[in-house]
Amino acid sequence: MLTLSDFDFDLPPELIAQVALPERSASRLLEVDNPAGATGPARLIDRRFAELPDCIAAGDLLVFNDTKVLKARFLGQKASGGKIEVLVERLTGERTALAQIRASKSPQPGTTIRLADAFDVTVGERVEPFYTLHFPADCLTLIEQFGRLPLPPYIEHDPDATDETRYQTVFAQNPGAVAAPTAGLHFDEALLARLDAAGVERATLTLHVGAGTFQPVRVENLAEHKMHSEWYHLPQSLADKIAATRARGNRVIAVGTTSMRALEAAARDAEAAGRPLAAASTETDIFITPGYRFRVVDRLVTNFHLPKSTLLMLVSAFAGVETIREAYRHAIEARYRFFSYGDAMLLTRRDA
């Protein structure tokens, strides 16, 4: 049985990308091509991300996550003067949100907090591990006006104007995430136009990425890990496109692990209910580890993930544990850039 330690690796810190490249599609792409029938080692092909249209057949379907990152981080003060840090996790109403609060002493329900030295919020009930916050006006408006972009903890600079553009995808539509669906960051309008011209199909879903995506796994036995929950919406038009893609013998390609999780969660639930894949708007805490049976996704575009992370487990389940180990060894030797602002992989499913 695989344990947490099986997903550890040593990463030279200088390979953690701290800034985005000047051009989105200028990043590198490691194609990991598993052979049909799951026999033999995968081929590792070093490419540029701009070559992606050459790797995808006409009629294949790319599925993107169109979530938009909120300016969800605030510095603030309690009425006592104590400093706090707030990270809005999700919007729950026009004037309410769930948030993480870091403070020397936990705030009590009914107390007020001053955020960004601009407005007060009232602390409501505790919804572990979050607090309910009541805003004095429309949450989204105040967050966008006074909040700060929540860059990942391994990016060591304060967010600037470049980050406000480059830590969003060009197709971001629906505000609600506190982390970017980073595989989508490599796509610019010119590359999307080339994919369209090559006959590649496109569709979107929405999964609002939560801060839990950065939470470490703290148990050696993976069965004991409690996965964070995230909200997603899969439209009927996407379900129909997937059925049509399957019918003509083409492949479904998830852009990012967030798209993958939404697709596989919806398909698993549909299968359990004895019905075909259809529209869904719900929460998922799907935890994909080796041994999982994939129902929808044939290929995956994804960045390089943190050691011992649930996302490293997901890609290992998809492409094979040894395949991912070998691919990561190659990427480190070849000086690929890692994590959110880093380079990408194109994975073929091990059993596909």
UniProtKB/Swiss-Prot annotation:
Q: Which gene encodes it?
A: queA
Q: Indicate what this protein is called per its UniProt record.
A: S-adenosylmethionine:tRNA ribosyltransferase-isomerase
Subcellular locations according to the entry: Cytoplasm
Q: Look up and give the organism this protein is from.
A: Paraburkholderia xenovorans (strain LB400)
UniProt catalytic activity: 7-aminomethyl-7-carbaguanosine(34) in tRNA + S-adenosyl-L-methionine = epoxyqueuosine(34) in tRNA + adenine + L-methionine + 2 H(+)
- Spell out the family assignment given in the record's similarity comment: Belongs to the QueA family.
Q: What are this entry's molecular-function GO terms?
A: S-adenosylmethionine:tRNA ribosyltransferase-isomerase activity
Q: Which residues form a coiled coil?
A: none
**The UniProt record lists the keyword Iron-sulfur:** no
Q: What is its EC number?
A: 2.4.99.17
Gene3D superfamilies to which the protein is assigned, alphabetical:
QueA-like
Q: What job does the chain carry out?
A: Transfers and isomerizes the ribose moiety from AdoMet to the 7-aminomethyl group of 7-deazaguanine (preQ1-tRNA) to give epoxyqueuosine (oQ-tRNA).
| UniProt keyword terms in alphabetical order | Cytoplasm, Queuosine biosynthesis, S-adenosyl-L-methionine, Transferase
GO terms under cellular component? cytoplasm
Write out the GO biological process terms: queuosine biosynthetic process; tRNA wobble guanine modification
Database matches in Pfam families = Queuosine_synth
Pathway(s) served: tRNA modification; tRNA-queuosine biosynthesis
| Principal cellular location given in the protein's record | cytoplasm
Q: How does it assemble?
A: Monomer.
Q: Highest taxon of the source?
A: Bacteria
SUPFAM superfamilies named in the record: QueA-like (SSF111337)
